[in-house]
Design a protein with these regions (language model features):
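Short beta-strand-centered segment that lines the nucleotide-binding/catalytic pocket of NTP-utilizing
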Residues: 16-31
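Conserved phosphate-donor/acceptor-positioning beta-strand/loop module used by diverse small-molecule
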Residues: 87-93, 104-128
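Short glycine-/polar-rich loops that comprise or flank the Walker A/P-loop
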Residues: 18-20, 105-110, 158-162
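A conserved segment at the C-terminal end of the G1
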Residues: 6-18
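ATP-dependent small-molecule kinase phosphotransfer cores
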Residues: 27-88, 92-94
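Small-molecule kinase domains that catalyze NTP-dependent phosphoryl transfer to phosphate-bearing small molecules
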Residues: 130-180
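Conserved AAA+ ATPase "sensor/coupling" helix adjacent to the nucleotide-binding pocket
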Residues: 56-59, 127-132, 180-184
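Short, small-residue-biased leader/transition segments that mark boundaries at the very start
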Residues: 1-5
Length: 186
C-alpha cells in the first residue's frame, strides 16, 4: 500500500528512537482548508517576510507565480533550530535542501528522497484539491508540472542525491528510512 509523503513524515517524527524534531516552514500563501497556523506552516504576510529578510533570518526562500498570485515558501533561522546536536526533519524542495546544506554544512544536512510514481502523485493531488472549498485545478496542474521539473533526474544528480527510497511497501520503506537515519548518527 502506498502512503503519502506527509504520512511518512509523521511516522518518522513519532518514532522515538530517531529523536527527530519538526521544522515548520513559513509561507505567504493563504491557509487551506484543514490547515492550522504553526502546524503545517507559519502563515505570514509580505511585511513579516520583509522584516525577517532585513534581520537576516531567512535561510532559503522560493517564490512561485501561481494562478492566485505569487506565493513564497521559506525556512527561517528561528526558535525551532536551537541545538545543532539535535536531529530535525523538514519537507522541502531540492532548492531548499541545497540552501539548508550550504547554511548549516553538508555534514549536518542529510537528504531523504522518497520517490512516488507520477500517476499516484497526480491522483493524490486531485483528491486533495477536491476537498477544498474552491478547488483550483489549474493551479494543481501547474504545481504538478513544476514538481516534475524541480525534481528531474538532472536536478537530483546536481544536488548529489544518491540515496532514494521507493514509496511502495509500507513497512519496508519505513524500515529502510529509519535504518538510514540511524546510520547517519553513527
Amino acid at each position: 500500500r502506498q502512503m503519502c509523503i506527509r504520512d511518512r513524515y509523521k511516522m518518522l517524527l513519532e518514532d522515538g528512537a530517531l529523536s527527530l524534531k519538526k521544522i515548520i516552514p513559513y509561507t505567504t500563501r493563504p491557509m487551506r482548508r484543514g490547515e492550522t497556523d504553526g502546524v503545517e506552516y507559519y502563515f505570514c504576510g509580505e511585511k513579516e517576510l520583509a522584516d525577517l529578510l532585513k534581520r537576516g533570518k531567512v535561510i532559503e526562500l522560493r517564490a512561485y507565480d501561481t494562478v492566485q498570485g505569487v506565493w513564497k515558501y521559506f525556512t527561517v533561522d528561528d526558535h525551532q533550530i536551537q541545538d545543532l546536536r539535535q536531529n530535525y526533519l523538514l519537507i522541502g524542495t531540492l532548492e531548499a535542501y541545497g540552501k539548508l546544506r550550504d547554511y548549516f554544512g553538508k555534514e549536518r544536512v542529510v537528504p531523504i528522497y522518497i520517490e512516488v510514481e507520477d500517476g499516484i502523485r497526480l491522483e493524490r493531488a486531485i483528491g486533495r484539491e477536491r476537498q477544498q472549498r474552491e478547488p483550483h485545478y489549474e493551479e494543481m496542474c501547474r504545481r504538478f508540472l513544476a514538481d516534475a521539473a524541480d525534481f528531474s533526474e538532472e536536478k537530483l544528480l546536481d544536488a548529489q542525491i544518491t540515496v532514494r527510497f521507493a514509496n511502495d511497501d509500507l513497512k519496508q520503506t519505513e524500515e529502510n528510512i529509519r535504518d538510514y537515519i540511524l546510520s547517519q548518527n553513527d
